[in-house]
UniProtKB/Swiss-Prot annotation:
Database matches in HAMAP family: ATP_synth_gamma_bact
Disulfide bonds listed in the record: none
Gene Ontology biological process: proton motive force-driven plasma membrane ATP synthesis
Keyword terms, alphabetized: ATP synthesis, Cell inner membrane, Cell membrane, CF(1), Hydrogen ion transport, Ion transport, Membrane, Transport
The name this protein goes by in its record: ATP synthase gamma chain
A GO cellular component annotation in the UniProt record: plasma membrane
CDD domains the record matches: F1-ATPase_gamma
Quaternary structure, from the entry: F-type ATPases have 2 components, CF(1) - the catalytic core - and CF(0) - the membrane proton channel. CF(1) has five subunits: alpha(3), beta(3), gamma(1), delta(1), epsilon(1). CF(0) has three main subunits: a, b and c.
UniProt cross-references to Pfam families, sorted A to Z: ATP-synt
The UniProt record lists the keyword Cell membrane: yes
Organism: Neisseria meningitidis serogroup A / serotype 4A (strain DSM 15465 / Z2491)
Keyword Cell membrane listed: yes
Membrane topology: Peripheral membrane protein
Organism lineage string: Bacteria, Pseudomonadati, Pseudomonadota, Betaproteobacteria, Neisseriales
Length: 291
């Protein structure tokens, strides 16, 4: 029964793995719900910032703020690439990187250079492995990242845009659609589109006059920064929800596969045990007949 003991050892090993994947599935489910709630709570703030910024930009058309300039010749582009810090989340990072690298290749074919800010270690390692120009990064962000962790890399990229050293900035991340579906997204963060600055405030029969301190332009310049930061943070939260959903699905598949493997191993064990019993009975009968 040496073979039977080996099979039992394999069964116990697979059962232990199944317990781990089941626990990881449950943890990912909990984290995904918390991230979704964080996304929901952050949206009203981002929308209010956008509305006030839109109002100020429309009433101060000669603001001269570099971050609101819309028409530039594209010579150099920046990317904010958001990926996860950990693996075991299916093809989530691979799909984002595929979309990102296709756009980088398209720019390179046009002779346009790139500068990349990586949020998440998977994207950073991928960019470094193929020799892309990574100018800043933030990794090991945890399950509840703080905006302060992102300010350094983002500020550097935004300042380069203000100095006309970068002419466009893309935001690349995995968008959360539902538990079973996450899609790679690429959006133009800068220049800010007309759909953002356009009149989106609720219509009112009254005409309000606002006073801004110290000045309307100072408030507008401040809000533009806060708006850009809120968009990036929303994308990061979206990506984290996608990561947990993908990991939950991957761990469920692993748990189910482990269950199927255990069934197959038990079947093999029972067959080998039955064969061993049959052999022993045959030997006993043969011995009795010989006597």
């Amino acid at each position: 029964m040496a073979v039977g003991k080996e099979i039992l050892t394999k069964i116990r090993s697979v059962q232990n793995t199944q317990k781990i994947t089941k626990a990881m599935q449950m943890v990912s489910t909990s984290k995904m719900r918390k991230t979704q709630e964080r996304m929901r709570l952050a949206r009203p703030y981002a929308e209010k910032v956008r509305m006030v910024m839109s109002h100020l930009a429309q009433t101060n058309t000669d603001h001269g703020i570099p971050l609101l300039e819309s028409h530039r010749e594209i010579r150099r582009v920046g990317f904010i690439l958001i990926t996860s810090d950990k693996g075991l989340c299916g093809g989530l990072n691979a799909n984002v990187l595929k979309k990102f690298l296709a756009q980088v290749q398209e720019y390179q074919n046009q002779g346009i250079e790139e500068e990349i800010v990586c949020l998440g270690s998977k994207g950073l390692m991928a960019c470094q492995s193929i020799g892309l120009n990574v100018v800043a990064s933030a990794v090991n962000l945890g399950d509840t990242p703080k905006m302060e962790m992102l300010l350094g890399p983002l500020t550097e990229l935004f300042q380069r845009y203000e100095k006309h050293e970068i002419d466009r900035i893309h935001l690349v991340y995995s968008g959360f659609v539902n538990t079973m579906r996450q899609e790679p997204r690429m959006e133009v963060l800068l220049p800010i589109g007309e759909n953002v600055i356009g009149d989106s405030a609720p219509k009112s029969p009254f005409s309000w006059e606002y006073r801004y301190e110290p000045t309307a332009l100072a408030v507008l310049e401040y809000l533009v920064r806060r708006y850009l930061e809120s968009v990036v943070y929303q994308a990061l939260s979206d990506n984290m929800a996608s990561e947990q959903a993908a990991r939950m699905v991957a761990m469920k598949a692993a748990t189910d596969n482990a269950g199927n493997a255990i069934k197959e191993l038990r079947l093999v064990y029972n067959k080998s045990r039955q064969a061993a019993i049959t052999t022993e009975l045959s030997e006993i009968v043969a011995g009795a007949a010989a006597v």
